[in-house]
Every structure is written in C-alpha cells, then in structure tokens.
C-alpha cells in the first residue's frame, strides 16, 4: 500500500498557497485568522 503523502511542490502551492487562499472567501478568513494570531507564515 502506498503512503498518502506524495509531496509535489506545484500541488502544495496550488492548494495551500497564498494566491489560492485569496481566491475564496473562506481562504481569506484563514489568512485573517492567521494574521490575527500573529503567524510568521500566513500560507505555504
């Protein structure tokens, strides 16, 4: 059985990247929450 995590930089950026977060309303909420919390990195 293969493992579930098969790393890919492109997929990582496309699904969890900053631009991807900005595209959806909920993604913007994620960024806002992380800003409020004071995260050093907002997205991948």
Curated annotation (Swiss-Prot):
UniProt region (Disordered), positions on chain = 1-44
The GO terms describing molecular function are: structural constituent of ribosome
Q: Which GO terms describe its cellular component?
A: ribonucleoprotein complex; ribosome
Q: Does the keyword Acetylation apply?
A: no
Keyword Disulfide bond listed: no
InterPro entries per record: Ribosomal_bL34, Ribosomal_bL34_CS
Task: Provide the alphabetized UniProt keywords.
Answer: Ribonucleoprotein, Ribosomal protein
GO terms under biological process: translation
Cross-referenced NCBIfam families? rpmH_bact
Protein family according to the UniProt entry: Belongs to the bacterial ribosomal protein bL34 family.
* HAMAP family to which the protein is assigned, alphabetical: Ribosomal_bL34
- Per its record, how is this protein called by name? Large ribosomal subunit protein bL34
Naturally occurring in which organism (per UniProt):
Nautilia profundicola (strain ATCC BAA-1463 / DSM 18972 / AmH)
Q: What is the lineage of its organism?
A: Bacteria, Pseudomonadati, Campylobacterota, Epsilonproteobacteria, Nautiliales
């Amino acid at each position: 059985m293969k493992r579930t995590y098969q790393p890919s930089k492109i997929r990582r950026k496309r699904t969890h990247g900053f631009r991807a977060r900005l595209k959806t309303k909920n993604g913007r909420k994620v960024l806002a929450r992380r800003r409020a919390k004071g995260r050093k990195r907002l997205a991948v």
